[in-house]
Amino acid sequence: TAYEIKECEWSSDVCSSDLGPDFQNLHRNKRSITLNLKTKEGVAALKRMVKKADVVVENYRPDVKRRLGIDYKDLAKINKKIVYASISGFGQTGPYADRPGFDQIAQGMGGLMSITGLPGQGPVRAGIAIADLTAGLFAALGILTALLEREKSGKGQHIATSLLQAQIFMLDFQSARWLIGRSEEHMSELQSHSFISYAVFC
């Protein structure tokens, strides 16, 4: 089928709900619809919603959304005021643009794993999906800025961020030390290379 609508029974007693904690955390205050965008009917249903929408957020690879006919250029023809936010693994252009992304891959490629943990331990990932969360925050900031700008121009725009971009941003101190002093970062016995008295004390 092209699309499916399911009603979730939300309860004020979240602890006894049949919906798991992750589902409740991520989907509270949302209305959901599942679309099969590999069908003409599914794409048509999406485009009907876009006519009245303010924002579209998507995390398809660039080649996939172009193939489906739902990239920014396609949807802006339907609604010129649409703010279209893309969150991808490696950005909309470049040699890795059409590769799928995953939080742990971004942590590794962005350099975070190489400075997390203790010396001799090997690369360690952060305990949370930090690249996912940071990229989402960047997208939210971009959306809000685009909506504010739209109040003046009357036009929407395409904003984009990526897991890798967000992860590299998180290593701003390390990047500055390398660019200016060619100082290479290493795992650091729970101490900071930037600040005095920034460590774990017992």
Where is each model-derived feature located?
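N-terminal Rossmann-like NAD(P) cofactor-binding subdomain of oxidoreductases
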Residues: 58-114
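Short, small-residue-biased leader/transition segments that mark boundaries at the very start
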Residues: 1-16, 186-192
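Hydrophobic/aromatic beta-strand patches that form the interior of the parallel beta-sheet core
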Residues: 33, 83-85, 159
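Domain-scale activation on soluble regions of proteins
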Residues: 52, 199-201
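A contiguous active-site-proximal alpha/beta segment in oxidoreductase catalytic domains
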Residues: 29, 82, 104, 133, ...
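A structured beta-alpha segment of the ubiquitous adenosine-cofactor-binding alpha/beta core
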Residues: 21-77
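Acidic, glycine-rich segments within the central catalytic cores of soluble metabolic enzymes
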Residues: 17, 109-188, 192-197
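Active-site beta-alpha turn of Rossmann-fold NAD(P)-dependent dehydrogenases/reductases
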Residues: 30, 85-88, 191
